[in-house]
Design a protein with these regions (language model features):
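Compositionally biased alpha-helical segments
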Residues: 20-71
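Basic side chains
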Residues: 2-3, 319
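Sec/Tat signal peptide C-region and signal peptidase I cleavage site
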Residues: 15-19
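Sec-dependent N-terminal signal peptides
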Residues: 4-13
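A composition-driven surface/loop motif
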Residues: 70-409
Length: 409
């Protein structure tokens, strides 16, 4: 009874206060309400408290605090990671839409189907045994602000809702994600949906089970200030379904045992730009040494309109760029296109897993299955190794402009 009276007194005070914040503590989750928009405070037989559509069991409430701090930003869930002491703060206007669980430094949230506006999930802090999981039915924003997260058992960050995910790297921030070895996860940072990456921050990725980063739909790097560093991966650096597009920023990939950037087709052949890579600007640097590895690999077309691409690739059967469809290298107005490749290796011989027959993959600077059009830009290439070649084209070659330098010729 004393507890209930305390709750009633606190809520009454909050309702009367202007420019104050009411915080409801349940475990390591804080629900933040601005007093001026709180509205009615309802008790249900003293066993439940309802605030802005969110119902709390009074037995689950640890405390209610009213202070003059600023309320959480609207439509926001904040996660402050701290080894063994991670806290979640959620704004009251979306609390009723989110099912949140905190277990140690592992945080999961599932948004209900009633969610009809975008929610921002803001992550920061450090945890050496933590993770973030999100599922839902509506597009969302994921913001990293000096986040350092390692999950020894699975993905560090897994977004599972299948919608557009706006990934923002806070300006000036450095963020690092690492997963554990021997898990079942597809990537250290996985998005089931399509990702648009922005912000003048840095994201470091280490994939100890499979890929460093993966998405089941397109990934688009949109901002010139964005820097993504793949430090290592058991398989691909970036593994993207549908298409990968880069308009600016910096992408550095090294230490992978698979391809640096791999764009694969989805199951629906009607999906926009399926299996394509589109580079309109920015800088990509790739340094990888492995058997039959590729720097850039597009299952279908690859289009380069601008930007700088530098690839140092070595290993039998390796390729600086592998194009399953057509390749266009152009230089858009106001842009500069520069491709520098150093590729070394001999022929990789193997048994085809489908036919069971012997097969081989030759070392190439650029391998094009379809047609190749060069209309602008500069390509510099050094290729070494027995039977290695600079550019191999199965289809037609059309020259409209630009420069190609291959050593040896």
């Amino acid at each position: 009874m004393k507890r209930i009276f305390t709750l009633i007194a606190a809520t009454a005070l909050t309702s009367a206060a202007v420019a104050q914040t009411m915080k409801v503590y349940t475990g390591h989750v804080v629900t933040s309400y601005a007093a001026e928009v709180l509205g009615d405070v309802n008790f249900n037989n003293g066993t439940q408290l309802t605030l802005q559509g969110k119902t709390f069991n009074t037995s689950d409430i640890d405390s209610i605090v009213v202070d003059r701090s600023q309320a959480a930003a609207a439509r926001t869930m904040q996660v402050a990671y701290a080894n063994g002491n991670t806290w979640v703060t959620v704004s009251g206007d979306v609390a009723s839409l989110l099912n949140i669980a905190v277990k140690g430094d592992h945080v999961s949230v599932v948004a209900t189907p009633e969610t009809a506006e975008e929610i921002t999930y803001a992550l920061g802090g450090t945890a050496t045994n933590g993770s973030f999981y999100m599922d839902g039915h509506y597009k969302s924003t994921l913001r990293f602000d000096n986040l350092n997260l390692t999950n020894p058992d699975s993905a560090a960050v897994c977004i599972d809702n299948g919608k557009r995910i706006n990934v923002i790297l806070a300006d000036g921030s450095t963020n690092s994600l690492t997963d554990g070895a021997g898990g079942m996860q597809k990537a250290c940072f996985f998005i089931n949906g399509h990702a648009e990456i922005k912000g003048a921050g840095v994201l470091n990725l280490t994939g100890n089970t499979k890929h460093a980063y993966a998405s089941d739909e397109y990934t688009w790097i949109k901002n010139g200030g964005t820097t993504i560093n793949v430090l290592s991966a058991v398989s691909d650096g970036l593994h993207v379904d549908q298409y990968f597009q880069m308009d600016g920023g910096t992408l550095n990939v090294s230490g992978t045992k698979g391809d640096c950037v791999d764009a694969s087709c989805t199951k629906d052949p009607a999906d926009l730009q399926n299996g394509q890579i589109i580079i309109n600007g920015g800088a990509i640097t790739m340094d990888v040494a492995a058997i039959d590895v590729k720097g850039l690999k597009g299952e279908k077309d690859v289009t380069i309109n601008g930007g700088t691409i530098k690839a140092t690739v070595s290993g039998d059967g390796s390729k600086g760029m592998s194009v399953g469809g057509n390749l266009l290298v152009a230089q858009a107005e106001g842009a500069t296109t520069l491709i520098n490749m150093t590729v070394s290796g001999t022929t990789y011989k193997y048994t085809d897993p489908i036919t069971g027959l012997p097969d081989s993959s030759k070392c190439r600077g650029i391998k094009v299955t379809g047609n190749y059009t060069l209309s602008g830009g500069t390509i510099n290439m050094t290729v070494t190794g027995k039977k290695a070649k600079g550019i191999s084209i199965d289809g037609e070659y059309k020259y409209l402009g630009g420069t190609t330098n291959v050593v040896p010729e």
